[in-house]
Each structure stands twice: as structure tokens, then as C-alpha cells.
């Protein structure tokens, strides 16, 4: 393992590869316990998570639903619940997969909040967009969509006195592939430290359909590049990112891209700067 790989892995608290099925099951149990502890320590009984249709929110949702089921069983308190929230922007191209994901999770409640009108209303009021290239406006509004989705989730959590779950994991964190104060905002991040193939392995452990487990990851935030794969944005594959984080050799160009991207996105992984 290169020294830089070791340093980054330590900073992101990357978990080692699952040695076998027992190790995977133990990790699932540990993360479910973590969710339960967070909820009980906050003296709250509701978990809220936006479900996009991707494997990350699918896996986080499965962990959350198991956590509240176990809390109901162990405490006899049936008020513990998990709320899955669909947050489409107008019409989502892969809505069928998103609904299939929610169906498989079987949350206690499901809500749908369309963020389209809110994002468009805000965009209409921003004079700074005047004269900007369409691509620049599209990029900014992509981040606005992510932030509006988090506003919606925290609004639901506030109404039901709950905690918001995030889906960030090590393979996204190392690339800074999240919107600051958007999908990067949450109260607890149960996938933290996992690489992408471990997230998929946990989804499989729950019996999730391969069509959802292996669905091409996409943030799908930009109107001019609908459904753009994450890997096209990264310039490297998730397999290469996973290998890098686990200290395995990767091609020279991938190593360079990951290290440079990690350095320039450091501000996204830190608290606001202060004097």
C-alpha cells in the first residue's frame, strides 16, 4: 500500500474488505446497532431518508428499516418508524426503479415531495444567472436540487421529530462526490467507511434484486446531462476507487486522479472554516 493510500484510508476510516459472509453479517449488525444508538441517544423515534433508486439509498434504507423493527421488538414501543421519501425533480426518468427500491425496503411510511416547483421558483429569483452560459446555470441548479432535497427531508424530520439519514460512503467521500449542505448533510451516515462494492454486498445480503444492486450509479442532477454516470464524472471507475481505498494497485492515471480530486475537495469534508 502506498503511503498516500494509507493516509487517505485512515482519514476516511475505510473498513477492510469482508473476509467472509460472517464478517459481512457482523458489519451489518454493527451498523444497525449504530443507527439504533443514534436514535435512542437523541431520544427520538423517527428516521427519514430520501430514496433515489440507487444502491446507496437502497442499502441505507434497508439498514434503517431493520433498525426500527429491532427497536420495536426490543422495547415494545411501536412508535419507532422509518419514513422513506421520494424527491423527484418534475418527472424522474428512472422513477420505476426508485419505486421498486421503496417497495423492496417496505418502509413504515412513504412520502413523495416533488422539488421541481421550488427549484424553478428559486432559479427565477436569482439575478446572478443573467448572462451565464446554460451549462454553468445547469451545474449550479444541479447542486440546488440536491440542497432542496435535503431541505425537504429536514422539513419532514422536523414535522415528525426525527433524524435524517445520509448515504455518503468512502468511495464517494474520497472523490468529494456530494453536494455541500445537500446530500452531504445528515444527522447520521450509516454507510460511512464502506467502499462501493461493500455497499452492494450489504444490499445483496438483504436479498435486493440485482437490477437495483448493479444499477449504474448516477447523481442525475444536471438537465443538460440527464442520467450521467458517476464514473463519467469521476474519470475513474468505482472498482478503481475501491481498490485504491483498500490499498491495492491501480493504474497510474487513476491513482493521480483520485489523489488530486481528494486534495481539491478537502473543504467539502470539513466543518466551515473559522478564524
Curated annotation (Swiss-Prot):
The gene is nadE. One of its GO terms (biological process) is NAD biosynthetic process. GO terms for molecular function: ATP binding; glutaminase activity; metal ion binding; NAD+ synthase (glutamine-hydrolyzing) activity; NAD+ synthase activity. The keyword Nucleotide-binding applies. It comes from the Bacteria. Belongs to the NAD synthetase family. ATP binds at residues 50-57, 167, 196, 218. Catalyzes the ATP-dependent amidation of deamido-NAD to form NAD. Uses ammonia as a nitrogen source. Its EC number is 6.3.1.5. Transmembrane segments: none annotated. This is NH(3)-dependent NAD(+) synthetase. Mg(2+) binds at residues 56, 172. It is an enzyme of class 6 (ligase). It catalyses: deamido-NAD(+) + NH4(+) + ATP = AMP + diphosphate + NAD(+) + H(+). Deamido-NAD(+) binds at residues 147, 180, 187, 267-268. The keyword Nucleotide-binding applies. InterPro entries: NAD/GMP_synthase, NAD_synthase, NH(3)-dep_NAD(+)_synth, Rossmann-like_a/b/a_fold. Keywords: ATP-binding, Ligase, Magnesium, Metal-binding, NAD, Nucleotide-binding.
Amino acid at each position: 500500500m502506498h503511503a498516500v493510500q494509507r493516509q487517505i484510508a485512515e482519514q476516511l476510516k475505510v473498513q477492510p474488505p469482508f473476509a467472509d459472509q460472517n464478517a459481512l453479517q457482523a458489519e451489518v449488525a454493527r451498523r444497525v446497532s449504530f443507527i439504533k444508538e443514534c436514535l435512542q441517544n437523541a431520544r427520538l423515534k423517527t428516521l427519514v431518508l430520501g430514496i433515489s433508486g440507487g444502491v446507496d439509498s437502497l442499502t441505507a434504507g434497508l439498514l434503517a428499516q431493520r433498525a426500527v423493527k429491532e427497536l420495536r421488538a426490543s422495547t415494545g414501543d411501536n412508535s419507532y418508524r422509518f419514513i422513506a421519501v421520494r424527491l423527484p425533480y418534475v418527472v424522474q426518468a428512472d422513477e420505476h426503479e426508485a419505486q421498486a427500491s421503496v417497495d423492496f425496503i417496505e418502509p413504515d411510511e412513504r412520502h413523495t415531495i416533488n422539488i421541481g416547483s421550488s427549484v424553478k421558483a428559486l432559479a427565477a429569483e436569482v439575478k446572478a444567472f443573467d448572462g451565464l452560459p446554460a451549462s454553468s446555470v445547469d451545474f449550479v441548479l444541479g447542486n440546488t436540487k440536491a440542497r432542496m432535497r435535503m431541505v425537504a427531508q429536514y422539513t419532514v424530520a422536523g414535522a415528525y421529530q426525527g433524524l435524517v439519514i445520509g448515504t455518503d460512503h468512502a468511495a464517494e467521500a474520497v472523490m468529494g462526490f456530494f453536494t455541500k449542505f445537500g446530500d452531504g448533510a445528515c444527522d447520521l451516515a450509516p454507510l460511512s467507511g464502506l467502499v462501493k462494492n461493500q455497499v452492494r454486498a450489504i444490499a445483496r445480503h438483504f436479498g435486493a434484486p440485482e437490477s437495483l444492486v448493479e444499477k449504474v450509479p448516477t447523481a442525475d442532477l444536471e438537465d443538460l446531462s440527464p442520467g450521467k454516470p458517476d464514473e463519467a464524472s469521476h474519470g475513474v471507475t468505482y472498482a478503481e476507487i475501491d481498490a485504491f481505498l483498500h490499498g491495492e494497485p491501480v493504474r497510474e492515471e487513476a491513482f493521480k486522479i483520485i489523489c488530486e480530486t481528494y486534495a481539491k475537495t478537502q473543504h467539502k469534508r470539513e466543518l466551515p472554516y473559522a478564524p
